[in-house]
């Protein structure tokens, strides 16, 4: 065993740094030491000497001087927090500046499409929920989506007539059109001609995620039943960097793509909305695991600064709901543990306790081989960094453990435990870890690898599927969205039935991540349908990957302007998140000054509850499933008016004709007479009219009413006819 010691002529202040920044700084210091030894200090030590990191930097005073002296470029400011491009070689010196309080960056995200569905080779379709009211369509609201894999030419992003193009602005952070670009990375495109000429995001041949999520949030539906929520909204997009895009980025620029770069993307969308004096909601279907380092503290503060009246950010909870991610060893219990499996470099857990305890690693070949580490020994190491290379039987392991104070409670110590080997861990040779110490209360969080069971020791079976909400959905500044399920299968474009059963009736999809957050807050905030969703798919991805597995989940192919496009079925919190964003676009049309807190209040008052035995909000469903229509009634202030139903009639369609008469279309001729009441949005009854039975179409003359929004209430003994809707005339 040995404790790491980082010797350097100038030792960085690691306490100011997030994990990624600290790791990059250590690398720079090691490079510097190597240069001194080899006598090459005056020469470029390696190519990464010119690399830059996009980071959040909190500076209490004299920021301009600090950045100038350390060759940093300020990209955006939010009070005392800046997004800055920092040369890697300046990280140590920057951390030693007395006015610099924190330097924070984190690697980019993964997508939140349900990976289990791909593994099962089954991606069903869900065509949508109840019809939306005619009065609210998202008109005048900016729907922003930051994602990857955009087909900018898909007819779903025109209006319903495929005439008017709705994408107003697009920043591709991976674009190589950088010669005249004013953007930190990539390039921005504006207007119909420029965006359609660009055609697809740079990763559009290998990704199509954003084409799908954008369609859910704001697609017009183009000759289909698959219309999005805010289908008349204005669209502003950012194509960012995610895991899977590595081949598209020069290694010299790899650290320019971080959470801070994503924050610039959010700002880009919000700035567009502000410039045009429009309310804005942003959908973000990506994320990464939480931590106890506080690696997203400044990120949260920046997103909070970007939010406010008419400015709302929505993010997906993640798809780890079926993954064992947490266990708790209470005081009085001697030990608790689990078997683990994973890639050679991806077995990683985080432990949290206010008391000392013992960690036991066991490798099982012909017999048990045990290695034990006491937390007291970890804390005695320089910077509380412990590293040991140990042979257990015929297999060699490297154990790296870092101890530090929790960013949420300084009385609690946290230990990041990583296990490495030259080959996969836990497969050919079973491997377990165990927490020992009857006097310690210890919480264990999975960060990498899979927790399993093995008959070699049936005691070691700890783990529950909780505490797996991803960041930024876990942040207090963001509305986090989980996913519910309705349908269990589709027939694809080849006529094949493809089952994928995650339940029916609005039950939580088992994949949908579960709270609480690492600091104990309830998440997710809200649910929406996320299983079996049909939306647009990229023609460029289809053209490049005609045999890809996900193409088997296309439900239809069609031609538009000489290209073949698709409607595709998909599942995950990636799909539920844009549904909530699009719904909030309708709410913002009704009340453009809505805040996140206002929206949470709407959830609390109007969400539906699948499991009525639970108390809401909770860590499985949040406040429940969003009810778009009931939320609109609540926002307009008519939800409590006696005589107005809180649901729309499921057997009726409404159409406002050019002569300002409302056509009421029933699915079948009415067997009973019914009445129609017209209310103002202040709740005043304006008119009541009765209609005789025997017809399937009726006309209500509203030509004498001033232009505006009205509540139309149908009263009938037929439950499919009874209900209310909102009509704009």
Where are these regions (language model features)?
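C-terminal subdomain of the subtilisin-like protease fold in secreted/lumenal serine endopeptidases
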Residues: 42-45, 248, 279-288, 292-295, ...
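Active-site core segment of subtilase-fold serine proteases
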Residues: 150-211, 228-230, 276, 365-449, ...
């Amino acid at each position: 065993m040995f404790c790491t010691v980082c010797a350097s002529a100038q030792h960085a202040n690691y306490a100011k740094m997030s994990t990624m920044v600290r790791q990059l700084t250590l690398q720079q210091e090691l490079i510097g030491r190597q240069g001194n030894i080899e006598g090459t200090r005056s020469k470029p030590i390696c190519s990464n000497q010119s690399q830059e990191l996009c980071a959040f930097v909190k500076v209490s005073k004299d920021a301009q001087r600090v950045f100038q002296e350390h060759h940093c470029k300020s990209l955006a400011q939010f009070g005392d927090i800046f997004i800055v491009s920092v040369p890697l070689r300046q990280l140590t010196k920057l951390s030693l500046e007395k006015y610099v309080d924190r330097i924070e960056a984190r690697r980019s995200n993964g997508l939140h499409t349900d990976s289990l569905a791909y593994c099962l080779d089954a991606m069903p379709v869900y065509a949508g929920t109840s019809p939306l009211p005619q009065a609210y369509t998202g008109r005048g609201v900016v729907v922003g989506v930051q994602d990857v894999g955009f087909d900018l030419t898909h007819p779903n992003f025109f209006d319903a007539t495929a005439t008017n193009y709705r994408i107003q602005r697009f920043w591709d952070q991976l674009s190589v059109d950088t010669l005249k670009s004013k953007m930190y990375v990539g390039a921005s495109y504006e207007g119909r001609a420029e965006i359609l000429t660009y055609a697809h995001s740079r990763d559009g041949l290998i990704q199509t995620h954003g084409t799908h999520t954008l369609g859910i949030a704001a697609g017009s539906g183009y000759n289909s039943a698959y219309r999005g929520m805010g289908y008349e909204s204005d669209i502003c997009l950012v194509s960012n960097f995610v895991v899977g895009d590595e081949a598209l980025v020069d290694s010299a620029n790899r650290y320019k793509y971080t959470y801070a770069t994503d924050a610039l993307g959010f700002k880009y969308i919000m700035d567009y909305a502000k410039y045009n004096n429009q309310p804005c909601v942003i959908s973000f279907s990506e994320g990464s695991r939480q931590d106890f380092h506080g690696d997203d503290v400044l990120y949260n503060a920046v997103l909070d600064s970007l939010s406010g009246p008419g400015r709302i950010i929505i993010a997906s909870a993640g798809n780890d709901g079926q993954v064992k991610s947490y266990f708790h060893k209470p005081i009085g219990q001697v030990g608790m543990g689990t078997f683990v499996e994973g890639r050679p470099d991806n077995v990683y857990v985080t432990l949290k306790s206010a008391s000392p305890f013992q960690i036991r690693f066991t490798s099982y070949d012909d017999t048990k081989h045990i290695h034990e580490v006491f937390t007291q020994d970890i804390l005695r190491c320089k910077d509380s960094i412990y590293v040991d290379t140990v042979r257990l039987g015929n297999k060699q392991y490297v154990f790296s453990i870092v101890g530090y104070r929790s960013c949420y409670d300084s009385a609690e110590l946290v230990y990041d435990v990583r296990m490495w080997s030259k080959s996969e861990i836990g497969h050919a040779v079973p491997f377990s870890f165990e927490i020992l110490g009857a006097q310690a209360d210890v919480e264990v969080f999975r960060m990498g690898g899979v927790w399993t069971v093995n008959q070699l020791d049936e005691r070691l079976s700890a783990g529950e599927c909780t505490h797996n909400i991803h960041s930024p959905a876990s942040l207090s500044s963001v509305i986090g969205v989980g996913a519910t399920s309705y349908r269990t299968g589709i027939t694809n474009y080849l006529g094949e039935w493809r089952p994928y059963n995650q339940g029916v009736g609005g039950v939580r999809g088992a994949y949908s991540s579960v709270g609480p957050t690492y600091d104990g807050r309830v998440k997710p905030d809200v649910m929406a349908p996320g299983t079996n969703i049909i939306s647009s798919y990229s023609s460029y991805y289809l053209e490049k990957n005609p045999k890809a597995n996900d193409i088997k989940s296309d439900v239809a192919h069609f031609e538009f302007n000489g290209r073949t496009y698709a409607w595709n079925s998909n599942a995950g919190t990636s799909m539920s998140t844009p549904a909530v964003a699009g719904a909030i676009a309708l709410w913002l049309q009704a009340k453009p000054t809505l805040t996140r807190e206002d929206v949470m209040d709407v959830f609390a008052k109007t969400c539906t509850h699948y499991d009525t035995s639970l108390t809401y909000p909770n860590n499985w469903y949040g406040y429940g499933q969003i009810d778009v229509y009931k939320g609109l009634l609540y926002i307009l202030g008519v939800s409590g008016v006696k005589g107005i139903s809180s649901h729309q009639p499921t057997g009726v369609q409404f159409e406002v004709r050019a002569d300002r008469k409302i056509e009421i279309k029933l699915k079948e001729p009415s067997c009973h007479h019914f009445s129609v009441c017209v209310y103002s949005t202040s709740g005043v009854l304006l008119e009541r009219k009765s209609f005789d039975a025997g017809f399937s179409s009726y006309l209500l003359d509203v030509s004498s009413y001033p232009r505006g929004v009205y509540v139309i209430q149908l009263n009938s003994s037929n439950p499919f006819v009874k209900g209310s809707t909102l009509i704009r005339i």
